[in-house]
Amino acid sequence: MAKKDVRDLEVSGKVVFVRCDFNVPHKGATITDNNRIVAAIPTIAELVNKGAKILLTSHLGKIDFKKTPEEIDAMKKKGDLSIIVPELKAQLEKAVGHEVKVTFCPATRGEELANAVKGLNNGEIVLMQNTRYEKGETKNDPELAKEWASLADAYVNDAFGSDHRKHVSTYGVPELLRSEGKPTGVGFLVEKEIVSLGRCVECSEKDHPYVAILGGAKVSDKILVIESLLKKCDKILIGGAMAYTFLKALGHHIGTSLVEDDQLDYAKKIYGSGKIVLPVDNVVAAAYPEDESATGEVVNSDEIPEGMMGLDIGPKTAENYAKIIASAKTVFWNGPMGVSEIPAFANGTIAVCKAAAENEGAFTVIGGGDSAAAAKKLGFASKFSHVSTGGGASLELIQNDGHLPGIDIIEDK
């Protein structure tokens, strides 16, 4: 079901609680990758142009309240959202073509925050301090939800990377506002995610063959998404360390490769579907690589020697996977094929990334995370039909057949 979006909302003169994802990589106050800020601009610009009073919210990093007070203070200092303001203001003014007043509120609740919101004029923005400064945010605390919702007349969710979490800012606030008859909608970024990933959930007959490429370390992390994809896909290409659990389940010697012994029966069972494709050769080494000078050697999948571990798919596998990808009409990729940050073990990831990027007749999607970073680094990201902004969220959306808490709570069109 299509969700109401920012275009559907009448927000002139109204306070809009906007949940963005400004969880950007940074060193001190220097932002090292502004992609998430840039991605949020179309939604914020739309609200500015509509004359909304905008309360912007986001998290930045993690805060573990089980730590000592000193450690918590250090985490809060690292997660101070004020570093976002200069880049946000610059990007927004470039988009709307005029000056926009953007202020920062260091408070996350209480009189200071309430006054900052009351002081907004139409088309102005206040960015609230990191939502995770509040212990109750990640617990969907009803009292915090009540306070934040009381500040707003409407709600917009544009934080896809957090939509698989039932937090106050992604779930509690819109739930309360909806119960009061106030409007809710998704932003342009979330709308694009719903539409693009939706094609991987509801893959029509004309969009087959449908090929999924799954990498990463653990089968256990991907059980639910594998089960969902088995119902939809024609082939699932397995790479990364999770491949060695499958290979061991089939009776291959895997040396010291990472394996989940408690998943062997499950791996064997789903291999029987006939849709799982495994590496026929691997790049191995005696130890996990510590730096970029590490080297490896190629061996067949049934010949990994004792004392050696698999760290990438081999050249025959890469060629085979590339051929399967080239014949696909829909491709979903999540997870590198090996230790892709080390050159000797990056070729498998490069091969699948290149094959998907060059399949111009296919609808190609990267499910965020390490795969998105790899595609960007290799210069292929722009050739994909869609690069998701949320790794965990994209996987959960696929395994839950298009449902996520932060999206489901938004009203339908």
Model features per residue range: what roles?
Residues 1-413:
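Active-site loop-to-helix "anion-binding N-cap" substructures in soluble metabolic enzymes
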